[in-house]
Amino acid sequence: MKTSATTKDASANIKNTKSDHKVISDYNGYNYKKVFWEDSGREYEDLADRTAIRRLLPKNMDNFVDICGGYGRLANEYLPRAKRATLFDYSKLNLEQAREEFGDKLHTVQGDIYKTPFSDGEFSALLMVRATHHFENLEQVLRELNRILEPGGVAVIEVANKRTLPKMFRYWFKRSSVNPFDKQPSNLKEIDKDGFYNYHPAYVEDLFKKTGFEIMDVLSVSNFRSRTMKKIFGTKALIKLEKAVQGPLASVRFAPSIYYRLIKTK
């Protein structure tokens, strides 16, 4: 399963199937690597993700898995830190692209996020980035991630935030009916008719506790995700500023991506 088409054009090329009555976003008919990343001017977003991951992932990991990791976009961040690394995704196309680039350095597994093929406590650490917006049942996903982590294992999870400043202004000025202060997830079906979920930080943080995780660190990521800002200031300047504010701005939870470093406690 892959997770990250954020435009109408992208979602139009993605099939949706059902698994145990849950929607699965199938990127097999969509070249996520080329269309969404390589040809779409998202260098800033990519570097912002990498900045956060370098801060949050453990320096040394025995058995690591990148959940819904697509074609291995972030593999160069975790391969040097892991004795063994696995890339898990629903899309066979994404996994084929990963194997072409990384070969035997990265183990690839295809499957359903709601019922992964992994053993209880198999991994010491995991990463999940740009995935939560496709989950019909986030709690079930978190319980599955908890199951495959060993006791005390680390999970670095990115969450699509509904409580951003632009969304607040759109709501205040009646340009959007989506209430960013409502703690329930918003389902933005105008982006994807089968569901495109954004989450209130309080909602996901309660879910983390409910599903056996403790929050150890939080970062505010992609704080300057704006075509206008990228055009005016350029990627290099924005990333320099991004590095400076990811930690300090975490307390207000206003960025489109919120990164959490979690520990499995039960």
Language-model features, listed with the residues they occupy:
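Conserved class I S-adenosyl-L-methionine
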Residues: K2-K59, R73, N94, V156-D182, I239-K240
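Class I SAM-dependent methyltransferase SAM/SAH-binding core
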Residues: V65, G69-K115
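A conserved beta-strand element that flanks and buttresses the S-adenosyl-L-methionine
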Residues: L127
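Short catalytic micro-motifs in class I SAM-dependent methyltransferases
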Residues: R130-A131
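A short glycine-rich, Lys/Arg-flanked "PGG" loop and its adjoining helix->strand segment in the class I
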Residues: E139-V154
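A C-terminal cap/extension of S-adenosyl-L-methionine-dependent methyltransferases
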Residues: R170-W172, A202-D206, M216-K266
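Acceptor-substrate binding/catalytic loop of class I
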Residues: N187-Y203
